[in-house]
Amino acid sequence: MNTSLAIAVLLGGFLLLVFLRFPIAYAVAISSIACMLVNGTNLALLCKLMVKGISSFSLMAVPFFITMGCLMGSGGISEKLIDLANSLVGWMTGGMAMVNIVASYFFGGISGSAAADTASLGSILIPMMVDQGYDADFSTAVTITSSCEGLLVPPSHNMVIYATTAGSLSVGALFLAGYIPGALLAASLMVGSYIISKKRNYPKGEKFSLGKFIKQLGTSIWALAAIIIVVVGVVGGVFTATESAAIAVIYSLIVSVFIYKGLNWKGVWRVLGDCVDTLSIVLILIATSAVFGYCLTMLHVPDMAAKAITSLSDNPIVIALLLNLILLILGCIMDMAPIILIATPILLPIATSIGIHPIQFGIMVILNCGIGLLTPPVGSVLFIGSAVAKLPMEKVVKATLPFYLCMIVSLLLITFIPQISLWLPNLLMH
């Protein structure tokens, strides 16, 4: 067996297929099969590995969380969360930018998807901000960068995927770990928005009214309760992440159809069809990534990667920066789920060897991937934001540059201050 040739076929073939614009799941599958053929591995193992890859009780939560997000996102919740955020922070300088950021924090806890956040909130907030005197490119930049908060704020199906890939981490602990980093990201984006708004004389909203805030909170409480059901239920040990997700789907259906009345039954079937499309992609990717991960382990790629990185420096700070750099580069050329599935088995052992907790590393991975969603050439959220605003992508990227800095600062704080991620899980889970 020529190990070097097998590694070249696996990694080189995968990168080649990605650059040739093959769907990621196909690129993973083809490169894995080619590697197994070169290595002389029995291909009968292929099906067994794929079935095993998706035969996880924890992963059953993924379709439920995706369905919950789709139902809530289409059920009239966006406007109510925007009104709630407006009553809370609309009075500040650059009020609508602050509303955008805070609404994304709320909405992220329901959808768990940056793309859904950008499409749903962006279609409402970008025109609203432009009408109030904000530049269109600034409005779009705020929308797409704040959408990344939703990746950190639970419940997030990407957190479930990471928890499973990393070796059955506690999903509840990972959920709790996302709240403070998500708030930190929101705060950093608000600081950036305030500075730009002050410089450009963007308007303030109405003066803060406690009565108005309480009224809007009462209107939005049905949606926010879905988050409470999931997180409190999982953390409190009442039910598992999968069970909580299933309950949340039923709750979301009731709220969207009967309380907010944003969906009729025809709309429900349409939403479920969209969920099936999304879910099929995710599950195929998880199944093929299980084969890819087997090939990586068989060829000792994680060990080689660890030796290669530690040979560059034995300084934990430098290694942590290198890990972030690798994840940022991957984020520029790949979508989020494949990065989690492929990079975690390789990079997590390196991270733990320098004292980074697996839960903290999960938050780092997710935020790095989020930044990648805003970065060309793949940048799916960047493309969605540009399409919603009807602006050239280059103009949106230019307006986003100051917010990249805010996100990098947040990433570095999360990397080098473990308690930002670990304090809440340690407090409530032990």
Please place each PLM-identified region on the residue numbering.
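Alpha-helical transmembrane segments of multi-pass membrane transport proteins
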Residues: M1-H430
